[in-house]
Amino acid sequence: MKSRTSNYLKTIYETSYTQRWTCNKQLATMLGVLPGSVTEAVNRLISQKLVVKNKGQIKLTKRGYQLVADLMYRYRLCEIWLADNIQLSLPEVPRQAWLMSAIDSSVVMAKLNQQMAYPKTSPFGGALKLESFSKYQHPTLLSLLSIPVGKEVKIISFLETPATIHYFQHSGLHLGQVLTINSKNTVL
């Protein structure tokens, strides 16, 4: 079973992907917990110097980011193995990969990486090796809401929630696909 710290760090990383910060409400929504639980957990992460909080914005520290980089490497390596080698249904992959990534053996992970010929990205477009902390602090990615109508975008990755995966499969969307922004719905 994954630790509560690991779950929070992964969720902070995922919810702060384009703006490099998140808030209690986003964490509570993504984790399916009450806001009070988030406050308690974030305060614990602050005391461990894994995150900082300023004016409601929760950000990973360098130490927290280093832990996330290791977590995401193991998690995404397991995603690839489950999708490509086991051919598990894509909506099932994230949950099972998260459980498997609790294996904290660098030897096992190195062998798995070697067996799969050193893949670079997960089935959902996430990089196995995260960028350096200094690059992480200065995002170059944009959210879809910030792209003007009429511009083209290329799908390079997406959040691997079951709902998102089902949406991509149902809509025929795939990594590498180029789309034109026709309209925006800020209500979603």
Task: Provide a role label for each language-model segment.
Residues 6-20, 148-152:
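Short amphipathic alpha-helical interface segments
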Residues 46-56:
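A short, conserved structural fragment
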Residues 18-28, 155:
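Short acidic, hydrophobic short linear motifs in intrinsically disordered regions
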Residues 101-188:
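Mid-protein regulatory/catalytic core that forms ligand/cofactor-binding pockets
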Residues 36, 91:
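Key DNA-contact positions within bacterial/archaeal DNA-binding proteins
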Residues 56-75:
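Basic, amphipathic "hinge/linker" alpha-helix immediately C-terminal to the N-terminal HTH DNA-binding motif
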Residues 27, 38-48, 176:
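Basic amphipathic alpha-helical segments that dock to polyanions
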